């Protein structure tokens, strides 16, 4: 890949790519004695994404804070855990304090030092993104962030990727999406963006199409791959 064709903007997904939604299992165990924190955290995340899909397909947009709250109610009920209103509010607030993956901050620092424009592109509502980046410490290594909220649709709808490019005032060819989510990779690819899939689980790619993409196991590896492209 030549310097004239190499994407100069790296747009990072937030949840699961830079910060770990499943790491809140330990806090769930502490706050809900007798509950299975990891099971709740996993189902919570699964339903959060599912509800965002439903809302987009049905054209009944509610923001990601709402999807997060609704998903927690279901996950707790499915795991036979009863939540008081106070517990529900406290648990929902955990999404404002998600832990970054260990490789996130070092990779962002190195990529920014190498001259890349770094942004977060997330389903999160503006307050969720801002709080998460501030509390995780990752915000200082980013140039900006973009929420899907203004277009009232969630990933992987085509409109959200067009919104990303327009908000950045960039050419499609200059933007590469970095995400651990196969649906996000599918959506970005369909919209004409370059992609890099972060395969943290080590499993197969669960995409709708067989298409070329950069696959890495960590953000450290992504940094190394991009360094090699620059040679």
Regions found by a protein language model. Name each.
Residues 2-9, 109, 121, 125-126, ...:
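Asp-based, Mg2+/Mn2+-dependent phosphohydrolase catalytic module
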Residues 2-46:
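Active-site neighborhood of HAD-like aspartate-dependent phosphohydrolases
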């Amino acid at each position: 890949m030549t310097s004239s064709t190499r994407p100069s903007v790296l747009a990072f997904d937030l949840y699961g790519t830079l910060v770990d939604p499943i790491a809140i299992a330990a806090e769930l165990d502490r706050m809900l004695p007798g509950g299975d924190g990891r099971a709740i955290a996993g189902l919570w995340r699964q339903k959060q994404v599912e509800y965002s899909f439903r809302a987009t397909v049905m054209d009944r947009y509610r923001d990601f804070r709402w999807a997060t709250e609704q998903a927690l109610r279901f996950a707790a009920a499915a795991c036979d855990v009863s939540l008081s209103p106070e517990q529900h509010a406290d648990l929902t607030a955990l999404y404002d304090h998600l832990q970054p993956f260990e490789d996130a901050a070092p990779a962002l620092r190195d990529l920014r030092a190498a001259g890349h424009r770094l942004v977060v592109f997330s389903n999160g509502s503006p307050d969720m993104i801002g709080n998460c980046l501030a509390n995780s410490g990752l915000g200082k290594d980013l140039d900006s962030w973009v929420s899907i909220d203004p277009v009232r649709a969630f990933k992987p709808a085509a409109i959200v990727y067009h919104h990303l490019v327009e908000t950045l005032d960039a050419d499609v060819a200059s933007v590469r999406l970095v995400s651990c989510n196969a649906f996000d990779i599918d959506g970005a690819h369909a919209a004409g963006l370059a992609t890099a899939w972060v395969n943290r689980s080590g499993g197969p790619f669960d995409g709708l199409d067989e298409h070329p993409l950069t696959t890495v196991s960590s953000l450290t590896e992504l940094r190394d791959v991009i360094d090699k492209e620059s040679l």
